Amino acid sequence: VEHLLNEANIHYPLLLSILDGDVAGRVLVDQEMPTAALVVSDYRWVYYLGNESNLSFVTEAVDFLKEDDGPLIWFGISQVLKQACHSFRAVVFLDYPRIRYLFNESAFTLPEPSVFMDAEAQISPINCANIDAAMEFSPSFHQFWNGPERFLERGFGFVMMRQRMIVSQVIAASVARGEVEVNIETIESCRGNGYASRLCYTFVQTCLDKGLLPKWDCMTENEPSKALARRLGFEELETYPVAVMQF
């Protein structure tokens, strides 16, 4: 289905990771030489590529999705596909649009170490010694990688340790085609202390050192993420549709 990728869809979070095998998923196509494809991760992230006017395939795709219980997250879903789904099945969509960012390296500068005042907080790379703790800290880790071995082989990330406890963590949610998706999490009681900023500066610099382009993407109402993106040199590129789908 590589020929169905284009500028409009190739940026969707984790799509390339599924196609590259870093994330478990399934692909449904309309014919031997596909004009349309449905891509679904095992954690129910959904992407539709290609021809949206083939209603018989859209029906097949919706039936395919209905086989599993629970909500799905559909990235890039169009009004055409929504209307088609409504005409075939009783389905509910809840919209959660996201912002896609573009990294401007010239706007990225590392702050002075003195900006971060917590001397007890220490950054450590994620490795075989702490990977289990890192995965326990972030349940979403399993959505991004097919196990710790795959992450240690293909991904990278950092944890912020304070009093021998992880308080914040940044990882490559995916590494595909020279680009890295950033995923940052901080425990609620430690937010507002600059831990996420400090980790992300380290992470972005590591991306650049590796010759990789960092990617940022967040929901439109996530103001802390938007503010952090700006500080790191990311610029808003576009808003695109995402919806939670429930049968």
Where are these predicted regions, by residue range?
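Amide-forming acyltransferase catalytic core, primarily the GNAT-like/NAT-type
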Residues: 1-30
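Acyl-donor-binding surface of acyltransferase catalytic domains
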Residues: 24-129, 243
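Glycine-rich acetyl-CoA-binding "A-motif" of GNAT/NAT acetyltransferases
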Residues: 34-35, 165-168, 224
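Conserved acetyl-CoA-binding loop-helix of GNAT-fold acetyltransferases
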Residues: 55-62, 192-206, 227, 231
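Conserved active-site alpha-helix within GNAT-family acetyltransferase domains
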Residues: 81-92, 197, 220-238
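Flexible, substrate/cofactor-facing loop regions flanked by secondary structure
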Residues: 106-179
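Conserved glycine-rich acetyl-CoA-binding loop
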Residues: 179, 184-198
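Conserved hydrophobic beta-strand within the GNAT/NAT acetyltransferase core sheet
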Residues: 184, 214-218
